[in-house]
């Protein structure tokens, strides 16, 4: 039996004002699907990219890539979740900005009562991103030293906590003294205020001329060259975002010093259920046990989604 729910849809790319509430019909799940009732929805910088058309999707587009809630129904063949389970997810293509939805069951991860729905909706995209970057892309080990750009951002604050559990020394870039205090609270050993310091020079000073083993760079165009200059011989450059703009085509000669460059993204690392659980189950355990803390900067009513985007 179908039900009508509110959802947020865009029919053109643009600012927050292009997001409109619409009524959508939600039916019964088919094979391999589940219907969930959202209790919380996550907002992320990638939502802005998609809304603005930087990462274009076919229009009209129902927004949102992560959420949490309870399972209302499951389709044939779904065995890893059942009706009544508390679940959270991050998934692509988008569709999370709604009261309820039918979706593939594969990305749904059970969360215990120790994790609130608000935390569940805030931890999946940023938390799984931080987890796979550090533990799978870079395979960080005790004794490594890393540079994390935007250390006071969502991925940075989670990533630094994971890094410290691995015995890694963290150098983080931030934009202000206030953000430096926040980054240190979450485990950053050394902060660089990029608005008034040369990042590569400070990295070399901190590491006594050696450079870092890995750079995690979500900023893109503005930080790319400085990131390469911060690496040690055989160092790894992990570029996973472009908040300052896309990195221009790279001259391979920039990698002199036997450097390595990679551009990973989350969803290839979670393509199968087995790969998803490698990251998601460990993240859930860490959060439920309070080994790491998921920062919740603020919450909004569903009706205030446009303001949430303005504040991102």
Region spans (language model):
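C-terminal hydrophobic helical "lid"/dimerization subdomain
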Residues: 2-3, 273-312
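Glycine-rich beta-strand-centered segment in the early N-terminal region that forms part
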Residues: 25-42, 52-95
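NAD(P)H dinucleotide-binding glycine-rich loop of Rossmann-like/cofactor-binding domains
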Residues: 49, 80, 89-152
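Short glycine-centered segments of the SAM/dcSAM-binding site in methyltransferase folds
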Residues: 86, 145, 169, 235-236, ...
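N-terminal Rossmann-like NAD(P) cofactor-binding module of classical short-chain dehydrogenase/reductase
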Residues: 88, 147, 215-216, 238
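Mid-domain Rossmann-like dinucleotide-binding core that forms the NAD(H)/NADP(H) cofactor-binding site
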Residues: 121-197
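Glycine-rich phosphate-binding loop and adjacent beta-alpha segment
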Residues: 174-177, 222-292
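Short amphipathic alpha-helix with an adjacent loop that forms part of the alpha/beta core around
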Residues: 198-209
């Amino acid at each position: 039996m179908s039900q009508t729910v509110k959802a947020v849809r865009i029919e053109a790319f643009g600012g927050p004002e292009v997001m409109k509430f619409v009524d959508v019909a939600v039916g019964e799940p088919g094979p391999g699907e589940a219907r969930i009732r959202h209790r919380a929805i996550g907002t992320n910088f990638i939502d802005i990219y998609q809304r603005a058309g930087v990462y274009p999707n076919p229009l009209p587009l129902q927004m949102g890539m992560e959420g949490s809630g309870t399972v209302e129904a499951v389709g044939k063949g779904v065995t890893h979740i059942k009706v009544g389970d508390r679940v959270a997810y991050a998934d692509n293509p988008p569709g999370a900005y709604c009261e309820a939805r039918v979706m593939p069951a594969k990305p749904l991860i059970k969360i215990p009562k120790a994790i609130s729905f608000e935390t569940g909706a805030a931890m999946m995209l940023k938390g799984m991103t931080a987890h796979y970057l550090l533990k799978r892309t870079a395979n960080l080990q005790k004794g490594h030293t890393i540079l994390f750009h935007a250390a006071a951002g969502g991925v940075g604050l989670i990533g630094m906590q994971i890094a410290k559990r691995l015995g890694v020394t963290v150098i983080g870039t931030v934009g202000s003294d206030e953000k430096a205090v926040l980054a240190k609270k979450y485990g950053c050993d050394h902060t660089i205020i990029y608005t008034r310091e040369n990042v590569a020079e400070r990295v070399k000073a901190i590491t006594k001329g050696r450079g870092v083993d890995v750079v995690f760079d979500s900023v893109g165009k503005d930080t790319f060259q400085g990131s390469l200059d911060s690496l040690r011989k055989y160092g790894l450059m992990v570029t996973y975002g472009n908040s300052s703009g896309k990195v221009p085509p790279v001259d391979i000669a920039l990698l002199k010093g036997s450097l390595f460059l990679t551009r990973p993204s989350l969803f290839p690392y979670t393509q199968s259920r087995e790969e998803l659980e490698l990251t998601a189950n460990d993240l859930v355990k860490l959060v439920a046990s309070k080994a790491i803390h998921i920062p919740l900067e603020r919450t909004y009513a569903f009706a205030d989604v446009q303001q949430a985007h303005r504040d991102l």
